[in-house]
Amino acid sequence: MMKYSDDRFEIDAPAKVTVNFYNVGKQPKVAMGHNFVLLKKGTDALAFSQACLTAGATPENEYLPEKMRDQALGWTKILGPGEKETLVIDIPEAGTYPYVCTFPGHYANMKGVLIAR
């Protein structure tokens, strides 16, 4: 099933969080690429993901249009099978920070929350 290995994790804020993102899938990137986009506190993940599509999400912009990036704290590129990327993201304060995959259609299952206490 298409999903992140963890759909929730908790930290103490403020903090620098290291995210090691690895695509364990087998299908080609063009058909089943994945990314990790950590959104700012309070952002509606579903609305954000849908807005990415109407804002011009394409493979060239990693399915994260430039005008949508101000709503994110950090993101990876779209990864194909076996690819990995590490992010270090500042979590400034306590709150709930959603994360999603912005590859078209993936946000329904590939989502989660980072809870900062």
Predicted regions mapped to residue ranges:
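N-terminal edge beta-strand
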Residues: 1-17
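Residues that flank catalytic or metal-binding motifs in active/ligand-binding sites
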Residues: 15, 32-34, 83, 110
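Short edge beta-strand/loop segments characteristic of extracellular beta-sandwich folds
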Residues: 18-24
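Divalent metal-coordination and catalytic microenvironments
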Residues: 19, 36, 101
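Extracellular/periplasmic metallocenter environments
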Residues: 22, 61, 70-117
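Extended, low-complexity, turn-rich repeat/linker tracts enriched in Gly/Pro/Ser/Thr and Asp/Glu
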Residues: 25-29
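The feature marks short-to-medium sequence segments in extracytoplasmic or secretory-pathway proteins
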Residues: 34-69
